[in-house]
Amino acid sequence: MSAAMRQRFDQFLHQKNCMTDLLAKTEAKTGVNRSFIALGVIGLLALYLVFGYGASLLCNLIGFGYPAYVSIKAIESPNKEDDTQWLTYWVVYGVFSIVEFFSDLFLSWFPFYYMLKCGFLLWCMAPSPANGADLLYKRIIRPFFLKHESQVDNVVNDLKDKAKETADTISKEARKAAVSLLGEEKKST
């Protein structure tokens, strides 16, 4: 690790939160530097993501659990900058999930897939202004969306209209069936 990266990693490990509190307690009880403890845990997680049973679940919990928690905290905070950061993450996460759905059948056979996926998601949620989500959104998703926005709006509006028509039709048919059923019950009594 370069000196600058090591310093940023060490600063991150000394921020005040529940994980660093746990690291501090572990460091105090064992006498082992929290950097080594964190790197050991990261190494074990990486090995588990390669060889462990349920690696998909663990990867999805990491990619969903922490971001969901900090998204709720962002919503409740008066600062709107963090809202934008996590909305950007969720847009990238959604696009990634759609792409992954179609490629998962092939990618899941790749031995390092879940470790790489987890690394990708951690890069997207990294606590820096130019994290992966921000980069992917600004360079790929936003330009694509702006180029095709009117077409996407048309498709969404058409789908919304068709869904409303279908819901209205189902509702009318359900009412007719209920009236018919009630009418038959009255005749039989």
From Swiss-Prot:
Keyword Transmembrane part of the UniProt annotation: yes
UniProt KW keywords: Endoplasmic reticulum, Membrane, Sarcoplasmic reticulum, Transmembrane, Transmembrane helix
Q: Name one GO cellular component term.
A: sarcoplasmic reticulum membrane
The source's domain of life comes to Eukaryota
InterPro entries registered for this protein in UniProt: TB2_DP1_HVA22
Membrane topology (UniProt): Multi-pass membrane protein
List where in the cell it is found. Endoplasmic reticulum membrane; Sarcoplasmic reticulum membrane
Lumenal membrane side: 52-53, 104-105
According to its UniProt entry, the protein's GO biological process terms are: endoplasmic reticulum membrane organization
Q: Where are the transmembrane segments?
A: 35-51, 54-74, 85-103, 106-123
Disulfide bonds listed in the record: none
- Write out the ranges of the annotated region (Required for dimerization and maintaining endoplasmic reticulum morphology): 114-185
User: Where, in residue ranges, is this chain on the Cytoplasmic side?
Assistant: 1-34, 75-84, 124-189
Q: Name one Pfam family in it.
A: TB2_DP1_HVA22
Record-stated family = Belongs to the DP1 family.
Job description of the protein: Plays an essential role in heart function and development by regulating the organization and function of the sarcoplasmic reticulum in cardiomyocytes.
Please state what the annotation says regarding this protein's domains. Answer: The short lumenal loops between transmembrane domains 1 and 2 and between transmembrane domains 3 and 4 may impart a wedge-like configuration, thus deforming membranes.
Q: How does it assemble?
A: Monomer (heart, ventricle). Homodimer (atria, kidney, intestine); maybe disulfide-linked. Homotrimer (heart, ventricle, skeletal muscle, liver). Interacts with ATL1. Interacts with ATL2. Interacts with ATL3. Interacts with CKAP4. Interacts with RTN4. Interacts with ZFYVE27.
Protein name per its UniProtKB record: Receptor expression-enhancing protein 5
- Organism from which the protein derives: Bos taurus (Bovine)
Write the gene name: REEP5
